[in-house]
């Protein structure tokens, strides 16, 4: 009887831990707020909020980062502009083009 009770309690703990685990993939996000600037021609830019988000890690702790970022720029007027993703392949192609220009 004690053995069955021990097995049932172990099963209950296992289910509780499994249900409390975070989702399989989480995301990291960083928001950078630039200070407000004047528009008097003093070489300043309008205030923009920039958010970078990147894929997270799986529940087993293995990181799943491929170097891709979603960049969302929010202008001071509340409009948003989605920037294209720069992948590792795109960066490599750009580096090759730059090397050709130098030579």
Curated annotation (Swiss-Prot):
One GO cellular component term noted in the UniProt record for this chain: virion component
Keyword flag Ribosomal protein: no
Result after altering residue 76 to T: In strain: Isolate clinical 21A, Isolate clinical 22A, Isolate clinical 29A, Isolate clinical 38A and Isolate clinical 56A
UniProt-annotated stretches for the region Disordered: 21-103
Documented effect of changing residue 92 to G: In strain: Isolate clinical 17A, Isolate clinical 21A and Isolate clinical 22A, Isolate clinical 30A, Isolate clinical 33B, Isolate clinical 47A, Isolate clinical 48A and Isolate clinical 79A
Location in or out of the cell: Virion
Keywords per UniProt: Glycoprotein, Signal, Virion
Signal peptide: 1-20
Result of changing residue 33 to K: In strain: Isolate clinical 5A, Isolate clinical 44A and Isolate clinical 49A
InterPro entries noted in UniProt: Cytomegalo_UL22A
Start-end of Polar residues biased regions: 29-59
Residue positions the entry lists as glycosylated: 49
Consequence of changing residue 79 to G: In strain: Isolate clinical 5A, Isolate clinical 21A, Isolate clinical 22A, Isolate clinical 29A, Isolate clinical 38A, Isolate clinical 44A, Isolate clinical 49A and Isolate clinical 56A
Biased composition (Basic and acidic residues): 86-103
Keyword Glycosyltransferase annotated: no
Similarity-based family: Belongs to the HHV-5 UL22A protein family.
Protein name as annotated: Glycoprotein UL22A
Protein's organism: Human cytomegalovirus (strain AD169) (HHV-5)
